[in-house]
Design a protein with these regions (language model features):
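Extended, low-charge hydrophobic alpha-helical regions
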Residues: 79-200, 209
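Alpha-helical transmembrane segments
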Residues: 7-25
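Alpha-helical transmembrane segments and their helix-start/interface "positive-inside/aromatic belt" motifs
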Residues: 11-14, 65-75, 186-197
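Transmembrane helix-loop junctions at the membrane interface of multipass transporters and ion channels
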Residues: 1-11, 177-188, 209-219
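Alpha-helical membrane-inserting segments
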Residues: 21-29, 33, 81, 85, ...
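Flexible glycine/proline-rich, aromatic-decorated loop/lid segments
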Residues: 1-3, 29-42
C-alpha cells in the first residue's frame, strides 16, 4: 500500500502513536482516579551487569517458544473457526458463496461501525473481531477471507484507509490473554470490561479523527 520511501515513516508514526496514547491515559488517570499525593516507593536496585550469552539465548528461546505456541494454538484455532463460519450458513449447510455464510452475516452486523473510518467491508470487520483472540489473527483472517490472494486487499483499502486501519488495530484491545490478565489483576469482570470498552472507544475515536483529517487534506 505504501510507497517505499514512506514505509519507515508509517511504522515510526504507529510506534509513537501508541506511546502518545499511553502517556495521555496516564495523565488522565493521574488527574482523575489516582489524583493525590504520590506514595513514596523505595527499592534497592542490584548492580547492572552485561548479560551472558547463555542468559540472552535462553530469553530468546523462551520468547520464541511462547510465540510458536500461540501461533499453533490461538491463531490456528481462529483460522479454523473463520474457515468454518466462512463455508457454512445458519442451517449448517455448505455455501457456494462466502456472502451467504455465517461469517458474512456476523461481519455485516458490525461493519457499519467501521464505515465512518473508511473500511466498512464485512471482511475487514470480521478480521478485527478475530483480532480479539490474538492481533496476529487479523492478518490470517484476511488471508482466509480473500482466498490467499493478497492482491485483493487493494479492493478493500486505499493507502490512507490502510493506515487508518493500522491505527485502529494498534489501539484496540490486544487479545484474550491480555483481557484475562486484566481480569485477574483488577479482580472483577466489570473492571476488565470497562477497560476493553475504553480501549475500543479510544481506537475508534483516534482512527475517526485521523480519517477526518485525511479527508480534509484530500488523502
Amino acid at each position: 500500500f505504501f510507497p517505499k520511501q514512506w514505509r519507515g515513516v508509517v511504522m515510526i508514526s504507529l510506534y509513537f502513536a501508541g506511546i502518545l496514547c499511553g502517556i495521555l491515559y496516564a495523565l488522565i488517570l493521574k488527574k482523575t482516579k489516582y489524583k493525590g499525593e504520590p506514595v513514596p516507593f523505595v527499592m534497592e536496585l542490584p548492580n547492572y551487569r552485561l548479560p551472558s550469552a547463555k542468559s540472552v539465548g535462553q530469553l530468546i528461546w523462551e520468547k520464541a517458544k511462547d510465540f510458536i505456541q500461540k501461533a499453533f494454538t490461538i491463531i490456528f484455532a481462529a483460522t479454523l473457526i473463520v474457515w468454518f463460519l466462512q463455508n457454512f450458513d445458519a442451517g449448517l449447510n455448505l455455501v457456494t458463496s462466502t456472502d451467504q455464510s455465517l461469517l458474512a452475516k456476523i461481519g455485516s452486523i458490525v461493519a457499519p461501525l467501521f464505515a465512518p473510518l473508511g473500511f466498512g467491508d464485512w471482511r475487514v470487520s470480521t478480521a478485527l473481531i478475530t483480532g480479539f483472540m490474538a492481533k496476529e489473527s487479523v492478518v490470517s483472517t484476511l488471508t482466509v477471507l480473500l482466498g490467499g490472494n493478497t492482491a485483493l486487499l487493494q479492493t478493500l483499502f486505499t493507502p490512507f484507509t490502510a493506515y487508518v486501519f493500522l491505527i485502529f488495530t494498534l489501539l484496540y484491545t490486544p487479545c484474550v490473554a491480555a483481557i484475562a490478565t486484566v481480569r485477574r489483576e483488577m479482580g472483577t469482570v466489570r473492571a476488565a470490561a470497562g477497560i476493553v470498552a475504553v480501549q475500543c472507544a479510544t481506537a475508534w475515536i483516534v482512527a475517526f479523527a485521523v480519517h477526518g483529517v485525511g479527508m480534509m487534506l484530500g488523502l
